[in-house]
Curated annotation (Swiss-Prot):
This is Large ribosomal subunit protein uL4. The gene is rplD. GO terms for biological process: translation. One of its GO terms (cellular component) is ribosome. Residues 44-76 are annotated as: Disordered. It comes from Natranaerobius thermophilus (strain ATCC BAA-1301 / DSM 18059 / JW/NM-WN-LF).
Length: 207
């Protein structure tokens, strides 16, 4: 089982924590991670693109000129897709792009993502993170103490409104709940800052 340093808010090591092999030291499946990222991005698509086909465009019910004898190309409607102002061929319509992966595949993908982060030294674990009030400055100082100056996601075990409000105004920094982790957010941030409680929740939920 991998052992990782445990830090306080001042950036000092206060101990070590042993992580679960089945989550933080599993075989990495890049295919499943790729599929999980695609699933997440697909679910975020608005799917509101819409255009009219030739049957929906106003007008065009009368044949513009007779079939033969004019010397001009034959046409049956001025709303054909080849006419200016005509309908759109294969016009897009509002649709839902979201889909779901099997639960086992989704769980394997998040384990692969967490293992990748740990192997790259991009997981930092805090003994605790308590905030009596929203304080952006405190989060910035904590990240500086931990030598984190890239995109980071702070993961807590339970909902903490003060942490959320303290991170939302820092560019490149976000917060999340341990039981709501997804592969896209894990891989899209350079560092994961996990509280000790968050590790316990992750090992319980994704085991």
């Amino acid at each position: 089982m991998p052992k990782v340093a445990l830090y306080n808010n001042e950036g000092s090591q206060v101990g070590e924590i042993t992580l679960d092999d089945s989550i933080f030291a599993t075989d990495i499946n890049e295919t499943l991670m790729h599929e999980a990222v695609n699933m997440h991005l697909a679910s975020k698509r608005r799917g509101t693109a819409s255009a009219k086909t030739r049957s929906e465009v106003r007008g065009g019910g009368r044949k513009p000129w007779r079939q033969k004898g004019t010397g001009r190309a034959r046409h049956g409607s001025i709303r054909s897709p080849i006419w200016v102002g005509g309908g759109i061929s294969f016009a897009p319509k509002p649709r839902d792009y979201s889909y779901k992966m099997p639960k086992k595949a989704k769980r394997k993908a998040i384990k692969s993502a967490l293992t990748t982060k740990l192997n790259n030294g991009e997981i930092v674990i805090l003994e605790e993170l308590t905030m009596e009030a929203p304080k952006t400055k405190k989060i910035i100082e904590m990240l500086e103490n931990l030598s984190i100056n890239h995109k980071a996601m702070i993961v807590t075990g339970a909902s903490d409104l003060n942490v959320y409000r303290s991170t939302r105004n820092i560019p490149g920094v976000s917060s999340a709940l341990a039981n709501n982790l997804n592969v896209y957010d894990v891989l899209n941030h350079d560092y994961l800052v996990l509280t000790k409680d968050a590790v316990s929740v992750i090992e319980e939920v994704f085991c």
